[in-house]
Amino acid sequence: MAEATPEKKIANAMKAMDDGDFKKAYTAFKKLAAEIPDNAEVWYYKAECGNYASGMFGAKVDTQEIMDAYKKAIELDGERVDYYQSYGLFCISVNKYDEAEKAYCEAAEMDESMSASLYSEFAIEYYNNVMATYGEIMEDPKARAPYGKKALEYMLKALDMTPEEAKSLL
C-alpha cells in the first residue's frame, strides 16, 4: 500500500485535532513538520496541539518546543494575525509576558481593524494570569499596581483613549 500523501496526512491530523485528540494530533503534526518543514500551517497546528495537549491533557510537551513551532509558523507566514495572537496567548499562559506583549503589538500593527480586540485581550489575559500566578499580590495594592497599570494602558489603547480622557470620564 502506498504511503499517504502530505495532504492526506494533514487531513488525518486535522481530524484528530477536530475530534479533541490533541496528543495524537500533536504527534502527527510533529512528524509533518519534519516532512514538510516549509508549511506554516503545519507548524502552527503543531504549536496549537502541543499547547492543548500539554495544557488540558497533561502531555509532556516542552514549552520551548511549542514556542519554537509558533515562531516557525510566523517566520514562514508572517501575515497571519492569528499566528501572532495565538503565540501571544500561549506566552501569557507560560508567564512570558514581554514576549506576549510583543506578539500582540505586532498583530495589532498588522491589522488595525483588530487592534482594539487584540489590545483588550492582552490586557485582560495578562492581568488575569498575573493575578492567578501571583495571588499574594492581590492583597497588596502597591505590589499589584505595576500589573494593573500595564493592563490599563492596553485597555486605554483598545479604547483609543488617553489617560487624561479616561480620568475626565471617571
Each language-model region and where it sits:
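Alpha-helical segment of the N-proximal tetratricopeptide repeat
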Residues: A4-D38, E48-V61
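Residue-level recognition of tetratricopeptide repeat
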Residues: M14, E48, G55, L89, ...
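Conserved structural position within tetratricopeptide repeats
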Residues: K30-A34, D68-E75, K102-M110, E153-D160
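Short coil turns that delineate tetratricopeptide repeat
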Residues: P37, G78, E112-S113, D160-E164
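TPR alpha-solenoid repeat register
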Residues: V42, Y83, A116-L118, K167-S168
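Canonical tetratricopeptide repeat
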Residues: Y45-K46, S86, E121
